[in-house]
Swiss-Prot record:
This is NAD(P)H-quinone oxidoreductase subunit H. NCBIfam families: NuoD, PRK06075.1, PRK07415.1. It is found in: Cellular thylakoid membrane. One of its GO terms (biological process) is photosynthesis, light reaction. One of its GO terms (molecular function) is quinone binding. One of its GO terms (cellular component) is plasma membrane-derived thylakoid membrane. It catalyses: a plastoquinone + NADH + (n+1) H(+)(in) = a plastoquinol + NAD(+) + n H(+)(out); a plastoquinone + NADPH + (n+1) H(+)(in) = a plastoquinol + NADP(+) + n H(+)(out). The gene is ndhH. The lineage of its organism: Bacteria, Bacillati, Cyanobacteriota, Cyanophyceae, Synechococcales.
Length: 392
């Protein structure tokens, strides 16, 4: 007589499993096919990003920050310069603010496309991955035309503005992309949203209540998919988002399907913001020269008027004034924050990163208890984590 084993099994998922989206390890306790418990093990991609910041000037540190969330590197640059600008009281020219918003919203679209493709591949739909990468290539080409780099290390944001202005013909290419992309999002929806297999894999799976989401400190699409109307672009009024007409994507269900819907709507809204920003792009300087010219007096080169090659010159180091500040932006994954402490030195005394992925990942064990193993893949994919920012 063959006996059926009834004791629980401990299963290691990752850190090299393709569905883990990075070096995440999950210790999963199984009772047959049902998940009893789950313990995330993180830290495999820890690179000491906070300590590196405390030993670098802001200009030296900017090339590093793209490696936090390497799927959407511009947000890391934005929060890095915003933290210093707030502490030092540096203003940003209107044109520079518009350029920043254009880049950030294009980055949001690339992030959601990079989430959409692998998420559906995890669920068994391979073709949408190729579609998502096709559209994403357009944006990476736009990034390359401005910054010289495609995915990460754009190194575009500067304290007081941006590194370079847009090249000739870029705005037309950007508007062409927006006109091309909006119908493509509708195509994705027709292809995927009402697919019966897709619906059964996501509807009611990994649901979390509005109050639980707030208690866990969730942010971004994870929070808005629970019916909480909270978007830092509307709440904090940073950059020039108030100049544009757009809506916050909110869905009340709190499950994996709601998170998918939020991100799809966000891609549409980001596209609308980019269109409005490009059409209303103001003239003027693309950076606050005072932020670069912190050295006063005749030694300074910045007052000689040859601003044509300003981005080619090494930026003047300036001392971060005494004080502390917490600055946050609405990244593609949620609230990305920096707590900075300055002590009148060229390097910050303390640089604390508040990554959205790290906080959102903590809710995973609660979401997958009692679910099947196949559901775990869908739930983890719906959270949208990048291990670079989780481990820092």
């Amino acid at each position: 007589m063959i006996e059926t084993r009834t004791d629980r099994m401990l299963l290691n998922f990752g850190p090299h499993h393709p569905s883990m989206h990075g070096v995440l390890r999950l210790l999963v306790t199984l009772d047959g096919e049902n998940i009893v418990d789950c313990e995330p093990v993180i830290g495999y991609l820890h690179r000491g990003m906070e300590k590196i910041a405390e030993n670098r000037t802001v200009v030296q540190y900017l090339p590093y920050v793209s490696r936090w969330d390497y799927g959407a590197g511009m947000f890391n640059e934005a929060i890095t310069v915003n933290a210093v600008e707030k502490l030092a009281g540096i203003s940003v020219p209107r044109r520079a603010s518009y350029l920043r918003v254009i880049m950030l919203e294009l980055t949001r679209i690339t992030n959601h496309l990079l989430w959409f493709g692998p998420f559906l591949a995890d669920l068994g739909a391979q073709t949408p991955f190729l579609y998502a990468m096709r559209e994403r290539e357009w944006i990476l080409d736009l990034f390359e035309a401005v910054t010289g780099m495609r995915l990460i290390n754009n190194n575009y944001f500067r304290v007081g503005g941006v590194a370079v202005d847009l090249p000739y013909g870029w705005t037309e290419k950007c508007l062409d992309f927006c006109e091309y992309f909006l119908p493509k999002v509708d195509e994705y929806e027709r292809l995927v949203t009402d697919n019966p297999i897709f619906r059964r894999r996501l509807e009611g799976v990994g649901a979390i209540s509005k109050q639980d989401a707030i208690n866990w400190g969730l942010s971004g699409p994870m929070l808005r998919a629970c019916g909480v109307n909270w978007d830092l672009r509307k709440v904090d009024h940073y950059e020039c988002y108030d100049d544009f007409d757009w809506e916050v994507a909110v869905y009340p269900e709190g499950d994996c399907l709601a998170r998918y819907r939020v991100r799809m709507k966000e891609m549409r809204e980001s596209c609308k913001i980019v269109q409005q920003a490009v059409k209303a792009l103001p003239g003027g300087p693309f950076e606050n020269l005072e932020a670069k010219r912190m050295l006063e007096g005749p030694k300074s080169e910045w007052n000689k008027g040859d601003y044509q090659f300003i981005s080619k010159k090494p930026s003047a180091n300036f001392k971060i004034p005494k004080g502390e500040a917490y600055v946050r932006v609405e990244s593609a994954k949620g609230e990305l924050g920096i707590y900075i402490v300055g002590d009148d030195n060229v390097c910050p005394w303390r640089w604390k990163i508040r990554p959205p992925g790290f906080v959102n990942l903590q809710v995973l064990p609660q979401l997958i208890r009692g679910m099947k193993v196949a559901d775990m893949i869908a739930i983890l994919g719906s959270i949208d984590i990048i291990m670079g920012e989780v481990d820092r």
